Structures are given as C-alpha cells and as structure tokens.
C-alpha cells in the first residue's frame, strides 16, 4: 500500500483515485504548503495531503510517533487489510517487519534544536531520540500490528523502500519468515530537509 501525494486518505475511493492518477500520468507534485519557502531555491515537492492521523491511529499512539512513523503504520495497516491478513490466524513470530526510513524525523530535530537554544538542554523532550531515529517506523509498525518476527531497519537513502522489499523477499525465500511487512517511509518536507537536499540538487 502506498501513502502518496494523492492517496493519503484511507477509503477505497482515494486508492482508486491514486491508481487512476498513475494510469493517467497525473503529477502529485505541487507548491510546498508545509512551511514558507520564500528564502528557498526549491519551492515544490510531493507532499502527502489530507492525511488525518486521527482516522488512522489512536491519540496515545500518535503522540508518541513522528510523522514518518505515522505514515508507516497507516500504510502497513492498509496493506495488511488489502492482503486479507489476520494476526489471529498467523504465528506472530513468523511475521516480520522490514520498514526503513532514509532520514527519520528532521522535524523532531528542528523542533528540539529550537527548544535547546531558547530554553536550554534540560528542556529538550526526553523522547527526542526514540521519536526521531529511523528504526522507530519499523518498531511502531511491529507494535501496532503485533508482529514479533524479524525486524530490520534498512537505511540506504532513496533506495530504502526498494531495498527493504528485496531483503524481505530473501528472508521469506530462505525460510526466516512466512510474512513480512516491507517498504519505506519518509517525511522530510521541512525547512532542514528541503534546504539540505536542494543544495546537493536532489
């Protein structure tokens, strides 16, 4: 399942709209709306729009996840449902999770760096590190879906999602798992992400 600029909503209509967009060669890239780009050379991106976390996660779980993890959990739940998987019928120790993120949460780093400068080190969110590190997408998917098999966080920049799927294929092929939730997640459309990537022309 894919969360994309045109498929963030959870209903069947949006998934069909996304697929129709692919067939019709529609572009999901537009002007950045998440922050002011006046001082940036790059002003466009493929933002995920209409993502309502309250429709996807309970409030307690959502508060302990950054956006990249929320995307991963939402897409994984949708993929599970579309595949007709039922954890009550699966051995949880044979169901793994290979969901990677190339960069984790730059938003958390931006937010807490600002707090550090304004209020001092003692005021940094104690959950900063577990919120921002890239393996938390995989960890949160496993927790939310009850997966207890192999867990792997692949970090290979823009190849992360494809690499994760390849590693999952190999693990199933050699008998390490029966089912693996695999893919990649990213939420780097923020001042630091766009600024840094634009300077190296990515």
Regions found by a protein language model. Name each.
Residues 19, 23-156, 188-194:
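Conserved beta-ketoacyl condensing-enzyme motif
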Residues 142-146, 167-176:
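Alpha-helix C-terminal capping segments
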Residues 176-199:
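Acyl-CoA/ACP chain-elongation machinery
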Residues 8-9, 79, 164, 168:
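Small-residue (primarily alanine) positions within well-ordered alpha-helices
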Residues 161:
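Short conserved active-site loop signatures built around small residues
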Residues 1-9, 13, 200-201:
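Single conserved hydrophobic/aromatic residue that forms the stacking wall/gate
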Residues 9, 94-95, 177:
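Local beta-strand N-terminus motif with an aromatic residue
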């Amino acid at each position: 399942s894919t969360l994309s600029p045109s498929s963030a909503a959870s209903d069947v209509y949006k998934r069909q709209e996304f697929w129709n967009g692919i067939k019709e060669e529609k572009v999901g890239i537009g002007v950045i709306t998440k922050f002011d780009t006046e001082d940036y050379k790059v002003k466009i991106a493929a933002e995920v729009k209409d993502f309502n976390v309250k429709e996807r996660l309970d409030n307690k779980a959502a508060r302990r996840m950054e956006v990249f993890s929320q995307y991963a959990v939402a897409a994984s739940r949708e993929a599970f449902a579309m595949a007709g998987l039922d954890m009550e019928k699966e051995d949880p120790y044979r169901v793994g999770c290979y969901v990677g993120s190339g960069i984790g949460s730059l938003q958390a780093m931006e937010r807490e760096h600002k707090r550090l400068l304004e209020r001092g080190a003692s005021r940094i969110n104690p959950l900063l590190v577990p919120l921002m590190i890239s393996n938390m997408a995989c960890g949160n998917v496993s927790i939310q879906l009850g997966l207890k098999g192999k867990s792997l966080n692949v970090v290979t920049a823009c190849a992360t999602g494809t690499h994760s799927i390849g590693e999952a294929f190999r693990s199933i092929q050699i008998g390490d798992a029966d089912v693996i939730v695999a893919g990649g997640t990213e939420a780097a459309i923020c001042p630091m992400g766009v600024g840094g990537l634009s300077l190296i022309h990515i």
